[in-house]
Amino acid sequence: MRLRHSSGILGLALTMLLVPAMPSFTHAQVIKSGPPSCPGVALTFDLCPVRTGVGYDQALIDYLIEQKIPATFFMSGNWMTRHDEQVRALLQIPFFEVGTHGEVHAHLPLHSADEQKQEILGPVRLLKTKYGHDATLFRPPYGEFNDDTVNVARALGLQFILWNVESGDPDPTLTAIRIEDRLKQLVRKGSVIVMHANGKGRHTHEVVQDLHQHLLPERNLTPMTMSDLLTCAQAAP
């Protein structure tokens, strides 16, 4: 998974000639981390469709619930339609937060602004109409976006959430130890860690256990939901 901001030079030049330019995204609109003074870390999990398997890491979710670990889940519309029971269960946990992750996990920069709007709006509408939940967080599939993506999300009132620590948990060549070593190098105050709760991460459950039992307490870091991380104030001295 890579963070990708796309802007074709030729396309941009034509746009500037033909229509008034939309404002380019700012770093304040694309959120990759919380305040660097915050002694907290956001554990975020993408829930997108999978080709094989049940698409839900029940053991991971059970551990988060048993240990009362705050977490944020970004759900795609397709995933939600196939996992109604799991969506309802996650929404009931008071220390869990739910955001959206596009309708079909599309490569958004390949689509027009109108097409992107429909892709982003799909799961937002589903969460509201079927589950009575108002979505406020959005993460683009694959971390790919362009200015249209940011502008559409902003117009819909969604906070645009990326990450600054990539666990790499879907990579079948990575062992749990290698993922843990990567996190030890990257995790710090205000970090946003991206992982998966759809079963794509073979070692995600084990890695989260290590985070909770060792890495975070050893660094005096507390797991938080994404929203709590963004409003986190520096701990009193």
Feature map (PLM): residue ranges:
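Bacterial N-terminal signal peptides that target proteins for export
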Residues: 1-12
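Bacterial N-terminal signal peptides
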Residues: 11-21
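C-terminal domain-boundary segment and adjacent tail
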Residues: 25, 29-37, 65-67, 202-237
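Active-site beta->alpha N-cap acidic-glycine motif
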Residues: 25-100, 104-107, 115, 119-126, ...
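Active-site beta-loop-alpha junctions enriched in small/polar residues
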Residues: 48, 76-78, 103, 141-143, ...
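CE4/NodB-like, metal-dependent polysaccharide N-deacetylase domain
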Residues: 62-74, 97, 113-146, 151, ...
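A short acidic, helix-capping loop that chelates divalent metal ions and anchors anionic groups
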Residues: 105-111, 169, 195
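His/Asp/Glu-enriched short active-site or ligand-binding loop at hydrolase and phosphoryl-transfer sites
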Residues: 144, 150-186, 221-233
